[in-house]
Amino acid sequence: KILKFSKKLGVNIIKRPLSLCKDDSSSESAIKNVLDNLSFRVDNIIFLQVTSPLREPSDIDKAYRRLISTKSDSIFSCHKAEDYFEIWSKKGNKEKYIPITIDYKNRKPRQLFKEDHFMANGSIFIFKKEILSKFNNRLGGKINVYEMEEWQSLQLDDIKQINAMEILFKNKLKKFYV
């Protein structure tokens, strides 16, 4: 149904092979498949995550201009982290937790953090084609960020987030999309 609808709109469709339609298929492999099937040359890739849709109309243009003006190779969208999150990982089924973002043995007060911290929000990735070829990743080379508002970092991965998005849409986003 989606393919038929897209064809009616004149969209150039590149079907993803079944080998790239698995739960563990990477976005990078899907992007490479598209690039291999294009009939024209591509220098930069703009990759928008469907589960991170809160972009204002100008965000993509601003992110692209930032990539160019900073002579970066790749850029990702984020928001400034006003709080420093301690992220831990559970190791297997055991009650063993490993710190990811902190050194708990040498903890310093948050007031002593001088540098800004940023949380990637997954909304926008822009990168040079050769970065994907060289690193098999959307990020590499000179990496930069495009800063967005924190409310734009809401994800759409489960029903709670979808409900929160509906509330946000009614209260803040309607002016952009209606």
PLM regions and their residue ranges:
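Histidine-centered beta-alpha loop that forms part of the nucleotide-sugar donor binding/catalytic region
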Residues: 18, 49, 79-80
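Hydrophobic/aromatic beta-strand patches that form the interior of the parallel beta-sheet core
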Residues: 14, 46, 75-76, 144-146, ...
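Conserved hydrophobic/aromatic beta-strand scaffold that supports enzyme active sites
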Residues: 47, 124-126, 153
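Residue-level signal for well-ordered alpha-helical positions
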Residues: 8-9, 138, 168
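Short phosphate-binding loop-to-helix
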Residues: 2-46, 54-58, 62
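Conserved core of the sugar-phosphate nucleotidyltransferase
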Residues: 24-29, 53-149
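Hydrophobic helical membrane-anchoring modules
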Residues: 134, 145-178
